[in-house]
Amino acid sequence: MSPKILISGPPRSGKSTLMKMLTDYFRKDYSIVGFLTPEIRKNNKRIGFDIKSIDSTIRFPLARKATIVDTHRLGDYSVFVEKFNNFIEEYLENKIRDFGTPNESHILFIDEIGKMELFSNRFEIFIRNIFRLDMSIIATIGKNLSHSIRSYLMNLPEICFFETSIDIQRDIFNEIVKNFS
């Protein structure tokens, strides 16, 4: 069975940094696909998040601090669900199909399974389906996420769960790498 890794931790605990370290490490020996959600900052203040493909130049806004009509809202953020749905359909689902039969040389990275991303029903369905495949997955999940997808994933027998913090980031990196050797 291919490794399925979930990484959790409070905001600013280094989850996304750990994912970046892992994509950089695995890129040389594996076919990797997926996305990161880098913070967007202006004048040292976070103004939003982007979706950034890890194997192409695709990048677009996931959320911005603004009131925009016809968007989902999470706190001060407007979330661009339609753009994310298009990304899932036109990029992620196609990339997984292009892999053909998933094998040990493929890894899917998902940063993150969180409240903003789960405004997309398509994303929830994608997550439920992809975790059923024999495919290696490394994903972050919101620590305080109260959504049925969290309990679904945490109850899968093949899940290897890590809770990170800045202090133990390197140790977790090493443990995750061991899962692939």
Positions of predicted regions on the chain:
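N-terminal phosphate/diphosphate-binding loop that engages ATP/GTP or pyrophosphate donors
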Residues: D24-R73
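Conserved lysine of the Walker
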Residues: K15
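Hydrophobic anchor at the beta1->P-loop junction of P-loop NTPases
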Residues: I7
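Walker A (P-loop) ATP-phosphate-binding motif of ABC ATPase nucleotide-binding domains
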Residues: K4
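Phosphate-binding/switch loop-helix module in NTP-utilizing enzymes
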Residues: V69-N129
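The conserved Walker
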Residues: P11
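Hydrophobic positions on the alpha1 helix immediately C-terminal to the Walker A/P-loop
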Residues: L18, L22
